[in-house]
């Protein structure tokens, strides 16, 4: 999606314009890798896995609350959740006070699947970071944490 914006090629070698675009490129590449690993290993997309992990926190969650927790819109959640009841991983029920509200909870099979996701993510993390030294990981972690703090600061 962002490939043309993120990088261009000179002599077959990608040249990243700046660090920010490099970060975007890394994000896109990691998301693709996670999707591929999740689909291959568990038969679900990374986004669907995120839904299952969030629901594994316990109890029943409204689609609206799930969207807030995952930082996306309710229409995106509707699309992600659409197939999960058919695969018997999630139960969708209308809300008690408002029938338009949909409440979601995991089935035992959905919980079992959600419990497999952390190991797939750990393997992906090792694939991405495994060749970095301990010191490189430390510096990267500190830099990324600082950047995240900056991004999360309230702006006027």
What residue spans do the PLM features occupy?
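C-terminal regulatory/oligomerization modules of transcriptional regulators
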Residues: 1-12, 135-156
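N-terminal leader segment of winged-helix/HTH proteins
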Residues: 1-41
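Charged, amphipathic alpha-helical coiled-coil/dimerization segments
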Residues: 6, 60, 82-145
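Pre-recognition alpha-helix immediately N-terminal to the DNA-recognition helix
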Residues: 18, 33, 50-53, 112, ...
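A cross-family signal for key residues in well-ordered alpha-helices
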Residues: 24, 36, 53-54, 68, ...
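Alpha-helical linker/hinge and terminal dimerization helices associated
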Residues: 26, 30, 34, 70, ...
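N-terminal helix-turn-helix DNA-binding core of bacterial DNA-binding proteins
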Residues: 28, 32-76, 81-82, 87, ...
């Amino acid at each position: 999606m962002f490939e043309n914006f993120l990088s261009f090629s000179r002599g077959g070698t990608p040249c990243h314009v700046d660090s920010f675009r490099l970060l975007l490129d890394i994000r896109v590449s990691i998301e693709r890798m996670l999707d591929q690993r999740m689909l291959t290993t568990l038969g679900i997309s990374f986004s669907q896995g995120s839904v299952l992990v969030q629901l594994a926190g316990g109890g029943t969650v409204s689609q609206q609350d799930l969207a807030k927790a995952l930082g996306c819109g309710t229409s995106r959640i509707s699309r992600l959740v659409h197939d999960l009841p058919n695969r018997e991983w999630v139960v969708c029920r209308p809300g008690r006070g408002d029938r338009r509200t949909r409440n979601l909870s995991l089935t035992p099979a959905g919980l079992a699947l959600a419990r497999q996701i952390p190991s797939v993510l750990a393997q992906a993390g090792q694939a991405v970071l495994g060749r970095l030294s301990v010191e490189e990981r430390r510096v990267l972690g500190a830099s990324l944490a600082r950047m995240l703090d900056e991004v999360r600061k309230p702006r006027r």
